[in-house]
């Protein structure tokens, strides 16, 4: 177990030292809330890393989507190579929760596709928290959903030591109890195999390393770690902890106690439904719940066992579920990145879940205890916070009102200024925009255009293409993987212009962009609020030659505030640069895609389907094998966009076999 130690050729500069000192002082005073108000490109992540290093506490970093969580995880892994940095997001590639539509009498069964790689990372995250303190977990908002009870999880962990008196069969029984499966043929994560006096286990938190227990009679003679693929022995271990294969694993005693309580709740609910003459609902509930009870009794779990988690945990009705936060020690540190977006997400989670559960309970598909398999309410989330730092370029009212300390980070280490803002009339905006686009392209840069509607984005893109501009659009109908591809292609120069709506705000760091155009900037509303405008302006803050054009006939209150704030920052930045002799430099970004180190703008796709047209069947098979290996490696390194791209290419190649 080590201490947090940053590895970086950079030292805090500009506003960073002062911001670090201000936040540290506030946290050490015992203040619960603090805010880092940092402009785009000011090195907020590096400031966070320095605070973690100084405080030496287990840390949870909350991001508002998987993509930004992966980006942050990648950056913190680079800052802390000697420490544990984990990634905890929803493990569903696809998720359709169970639901009932009374109007059409349609019940939709739960349907989900679980990403095994992400499930492994989730187990790796929770097990790390039980083993050491130098742990950073970067999570999406899904971490406020119910997870298994950490006390039960810890209690079920199997501790094995060299020289321990332990029968082999006793360990096997315990492994089955914590949901490991015996499989002597397809040996994979969460399974074990037995060969004479050898017991091989692949823990739930890894797929590449196994644990070999060697017995001499009833004594553990040797514990060794081995490579699952090659069988090579990697080293000797004196002690090993085997964590449960599921976060919802429960002991036999807990299961036996819980079954009686589930049966009691069923009887009470059936009486209630029968008294309301809901006979069909009562019959349905009896049938479904009895099936679950039998499955739990025989197998120790059932499909949808999380709906009984309140009873399994021994919690009172209405009490908050156990979540990832409960796996942290009490003195943990919480960072909420892009807090102006993340906190509203946390607030909205509970209401959406409750409305769906109401229908399921009312119509006899679930017992009322299903209500307590839910995300945290916002006030419950607040109570679980120890000390938190909100991180945003545009903190909302909640952050500003609650924070006992606010540190501002306006100076960028690169000396870059906030962009110049030009206001132009709406009349003739498209023709003027075309002229600006041509001028920007001639300098080798890219353009972002933000519109108010999806239709306008599509029409404008179509018009630009007709004029010979390499343009594309991006809006909410485009999934994450396609979004990554579009951004990569923009950076590679496949496109010069990207048109979008509100997706052009947080997390789009493209140094090649030298022009951001905001159409209909004077139309008040969510997409043209002060916060939205400042975030959109920030997209141009990565290039020393960039500017922002607002097309508007009137200057709205939001525009005035956004322009005033940008000018204030420019003044501070200019004075600092003049005082220290700094010349603004465009960010030379070692390009990661929005997720971990998928080298984008410096190299186009290593392989292309076009190049495979002349291959023989044997060569195609060989290429599929190579792609598959690379895809697994990319997924392991959190390069999910690259993995998805390879997956698509494998599918196309299979069509050529």
Curated annotation (Swiss-Prot):
Binding site for ATP: 38-45
GO MF entries: ATP binding; ATP hydrolysis activity; DNA binding; excinuclease ABC activity; helicase activity
PROSITE patterns cross-referenced by the UniProt entry: HELICASE_ATP_BIND_1, HELICASE_CTER, UVR
Subcellular compartments: Cytoplasm
UniProt xrefs under InterPro entries: Helicase/UvrB_N (IPR006935), Helicase_ATP-bd (IPR014001), Helicase_C-like (IPR001650), P-loop_NTPase (IPR027417), UVR_dom (IPR001943), UVR_dom_sf (IPR036876), UvrB (IPR004807), UvrB_inter (IPR041471)
UVR domain: residues covered: 621-656
GO cellular component, one term: cytoplasm
Keyword hit for Heme: no
GO biological process entries: nucleotide-excision repair; SOS response
Keyword DNA damage: yes
Motif (Beta-hairpin): 91-114
Signal peptide extent: none
Keywords for this protein: ATP-binding, Cytoplasm, DNA damage, DNA excision, DNA repair, Excision nuclease, Helicase, Hydrolase, Nucleotide-binding, SOS response
Pfam families per record: Helicase_C, ResIII, UVR, UvrB, UvrB_inter
Cited Gene3D superfamilies: P-loop containing nucleotide triphosphate hydrolases (3.40.50.300), UVR domain (4.10.860.10)
Domain Helicase ATP-binding: 25-182
Family, as annotated: Belongs to the UvrB family.
Known partners and oligomeric status: Forms a heterotetramer with UvrA during the search for lesions. Interacts with UvrC in an incision complex.
Domains: entry comment: The beta-hairpin motif is involved in DNA binding.
HAMAP family, sorted: UvrB
Entry function: The UvrABC repair system catalyzes the recognition and processing of DNA lesions. A damage recognition complex composed of 2 UvrA and 2 UvrB subunits scans DNA for abnormalities. Upon binding of the UvrA(2)B(2) complex to a putative damaged site, the DNA wraps around one UvrB monomer. DNA wrap is dependent on ATP binding by UvrB and probably causes local melting of the DNA helix, facilitating insertion of UvrB beta-hairpin between the DNA strands. Then UvrB probes one DNA strand for the presence of a lesion.
Family matches, as PANTHER family: UVRABC SYSTEM PROTEIN B
Name this polypeptide is given: UvrABC system protein B
